[in-house]
Amino acid sequence: MTIEQDLSRIALQEETLRFDAFDLSTAWVLGKLLHDLASERNLGVAIDITLHSMPVFYIALPGATPDNSNWVRRKRNMVLRYFRSSYASTLRLEKQGKTIEDNGLTGADYAASGGSFPIFVNGTGCIGAVTVSGLPQREDHNLVVEALALTLGHELHNLNLS
């Protein structure tokens, strides 16, 4: 897919993967599902769900490294800054030939890398982020989208990046 095609599909993901309500129990269900998907596939990832800057779910699976928690934080910061997936922000920067520094951000606190996705609640907006780190950025993004689609009962083939 081209950058434009990916951005179009991600926009559809961000419009579709929204909750009517999201609480700590929902965070647990989503986090546990991500854990199970990653474990079944032997993926060495860190998984984080944060609401209103409060961490509500975190696990690092075998193979994840201490660096993954820092990547999680920096990717999540991109989502909470722009209220869009970190992969969409990364692709937009790439398309524009810009870096995060061109937008006044620092690499120490923000990562232009896919894998973090906004948690949207209908009628409210972005209330947090769900983040995966440990795979190539497109795969991190796809894993999060898969878990969100399954949690919300949406068909994955209509949403996933190919």
From Swiss-Prot:
InterPro entries linked to this entry: PduO/GlcC-like, PduO/GlcC-like_sf, YBR137W-like
Q: Enumerate the Pfam families for this protein.
A: HbpS-like (PF03928)
Q: Which SUPFAM superfamilies match?
A: GlcG-like
Q: Which HAMAP family match?
A: UPF0303
* Protein family per UniProt: Belongs to the UPF0303 family.
* Name of protein: UPF0303 protein Arad_3071
Q: What is the organism of origin for this protein?
A: Rhizobium rhizogenes (strain K84 / ATCC BAA-868)
The beginning of the lineage is: Bacteria, Pseudomonadati, Pseudomonadota, Alphaproteobacteria, Hyphomicrobiales
